[in-house]
Amino acid sequence: MLTLGRKALQVPILQGGMGVGVSLGGLAGAVAACGGMGCISTADAGYREPDFARDPASANHRALTAEIRKAKEIAKGAGMVAINAMVATQDYAAAIRTAVEAGVDAVVSGAGLPLELPGIVGTTDVAIAPIVSSGRAAKLILRRWAKEFGRTADFVVIEGCKAGGHLGFSEDDLLAGKCQTLDDILPEVLAEVKPFEAQFGHSIPVFVAGGVYTGADMAHFTAMGAAGVQLATRFITTYECDASQGYKDVLLNARPEDVRIIHSPVGMPGRALNTPLVQALAEGTRFPPRHCARCLKTCDPAKVPYCITHALIEAVKGNVEDGLFFCGANVGRLDRMHTVQELMDELVTEWRQNQ
């Protein structure tokens, strides 16, 4: 049993948030039901709502509330249900407040430094966690939270350079293979959280993500001092994952050589499959947005090479021609569909065998 804020995990496994629409209430609830932490992505959670094109904010908040309630119903009190909220999104604070009102157990936040997160969550029992890629980032965030809000993190997630989606490393370092490894970053972050554990009188569990694939990987990092791990790509090929089967099939058929580092309109590099869209972008083709959902703080529709909302929605539907398929570095190892329970059991069994 691992305590995170006022709640507890029976299994130290987090399911990483995946948007648009890949991790919603179905997947998050199934992971929580197994004793882990299921995570709903707030990114355009309402993309299937009839009024999404006309009023994306209302559609997203309505859907987010429904997905959290769905996950909680599936979990039946086991594990924890969290959201992943990206700092770079326009409705960042509003989405978090909606989730808190809906009864979410935790907020995990990255794609930027979540410096204001404690103030947004307020004086609630909701656990909060930053996603970091270095000890320096962890120190900066926790120092700000302590000084401005008199609060610290309930846990921390390290996302390494092998993660899927948006990455907290420079594009040059990613392409050159010069990024710090999780083996390098974990001791740094563990050292940086120690003073805050002493100051606030409770432990701050640290989870590692990005390239974690097996229970043996989990055993390796817990032996180094991590409380547990976060996985995302492996959960895509579960029956409970909220994406279409077409989306899952694209990842199941992916080879290691299909993975690319791309530039996202979010302003960060990302890891995705080399689909026709990615190939066209690499050749300099621009796909002007047909409609702006106002999803990102920094996006200029007049200049952006493509609309990431449109590309991710097409992906989750299984449209391989027009979709952007984010994935982790180990996507080529995916070889079958399974249930969330089967995956969780496999990971925990391997973890215990390798301790």
What would you call each of these model-derived segments?
Residues V22, V212-Y213:
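Residue-level detector of alpha-helix initiation sites
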Residues L14, A163-L182, L186-F207, Y213-Q355:
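Conserved active-site-proximal phosphate/metal-binding subdomains
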Residues M1-Q199:
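Active-site entrance/lid segments in N-terminal catalytic domains of soluble metabolic enzymes
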